[in-house]
Amino acid sequence: MASGKDTCPTLPKLTNNCSDESLYKSANKYEEIHLPRFSLKQGMIPRRYVMPWKENMIFRNVNLKQAEVCGIHTGPLEDSLFLNHSERLCHGEDRKVVFQKGPPEIKIADMPLHSPLSRYQSTVISHGFRRRLV
């Protein structure tokens, strides 16, 4: 029979050769990868447009400091705001903030299709007006 004490074999101690910083860097190495996002292609958007302050070499340092304070990306590889008729969405102002700056659009939900005050009694005009509001 076994004695009253349970004996467990002693396991060798492992040495910790990795520091906390190297563990943090290896865990976050995939967060540094950046994939640009673009909007859908539209004919009104230019083929390529670079913001003038990025090309102004006289006041370049001042412009870069101001952009850094505002939180605007100033990297060398993604200098164009528009590329191939698409807008770059990854390094811009948040869409919700942009929409809050403008005046709210008034939507008329109860507009009659034919108004007696209308000069043109066309369903095409009234449907087109409704389509713009939606």
UniProtKB/Swiss-Prot annotation:
One of its GO terms (biological process) is flagellated sperm motility. Keywords: Cell projection, Cilium, Cytoplasm, Cytoskeleton, Flagellum. One of its GO terms (cellular component) is axonemal B tubule inner sheath. It is found in: Cytoplasm, Cytoskeleton, Flagellum axoneme. Microtubule inner protein (MIP) part of the dynein-decorated doublet microtubules (DMTs) in flagellum axoneme, which is required for flagellum beating. May serve to reinforce and thus stabilize the microtubule structure in the sperm flagella. Involved in the regulation of sperm motility. Microtubule inner protein component of sperm flagellar doublet microtubules. PANTHER family: TESTIS-EXPRESSED PROTEIN 43. This is Sperm-associated microtubule inner protein 10. It comes from Homo sapiens (Human).
